[in-house]
């Protein structure tokens, strides 16, 4: 195996610490070609689709990609941002805003770290961002996936890709991984404040008359739970902690699972049928919040805010409220900083004094170092 060449080592160089935020990914454009390229990478991951490759890949390339690329492109087109200050895929826009906000907050607290974001599928790729961090002299990297609840289909595959990339390096950085933060007090507090702020602006549901808060998480095949994936349990715990923080009784909120793909049984109850059933029984108001998505994306903006609202109202529901995700809200940025700092303990968060760096370089040169 040939390992990649390294930048020339500089004595007296101040090693930097980096925080790498990783999210799922997005197509480069809302076009069938770009969406097809993204879906091919995403659905080819054996962590995502646990079907024997010999059976799955012909189906993926021969049926699924030709059919889904155009349909999905229309959905991306419906949510694509085209404002002067926000242009592109919502997931990428909000992910970059999160990284910039976290960078500002760390700087304000005197922590000299580099914050970057990458996507597991699509761009900016984990490989390209890790390479950029290497060239900036980052020798410690904290990988913080934007998946509060751990799953082999999300968190693990992000770690897999980091390991794959670093496996090609000759001089690897020191690495730390954040597995999950589904019950972290700062995360729960940020969720609580996000819902509370929305209710302060738009009024609270009338729970006494039967209004309901739906907490919709991304679904995964039920088989993953049976094989030991903790995702289902962590979603339920997040939902319970958020419900308690909001002062709600168990019947006033419900955890559901969305984005089912294929015919296999997934985690239940499913979000769409739940919304339709609430509409049928005449629910006056339903609020939907997606705690497992720290940034708004196609699953929240199109599947919930558009399709979910239609499901509810066509079935007879009246008042539908979609509560935006955390995005770059201040409480969430502060929570990210708190989570990161807990995992950064013991790593350098400040640059040594220039005199100390020069002394290191001089000592190395007296021993024959070239630079």
Swiss-Prot record:
Residues that hold Fe cation according to the record: 218, 299
Pathway: Porphyrin-containing compound metabolism; protoheme biosynthesis; protoheme from protoporphyrin-IX: step 1/1
GO MF annotations, alphabetized: ferrochelatase activity; metal ion binding
UniProt cross-references to SUPFAM superfamilies, sorted A to Z: Chelatase (SSF53800)
Compartments it resides in: Cytoplasm
Domain of life: Bacteria
Catalytic activities: heme b + 2 H(+) = protoporphyrin IX + Fe(2+)
EC number of the protein: 4.98.1.1
Role this protein plays: Catalyzes the ferrous insertion into protoporphyrin IX.
Family assignment from sequence similarity: Belongs to the ferrochelatase family.
PANTHER family, per the entry: FERROCHELATASE (PTHR11108), FERROCHELATASE, MITOCHONDRIAL (PTHR11108:SF1)
Protein name: Ferrochelatase
Organism of this sequence: Cupriavidus necator (strain ATCC 17699 / DSM 428 / KCTC 22496 / NCIMB 10442 / H16 / Stanier 337) (Ralstonia eutropha)
Gene: hemH
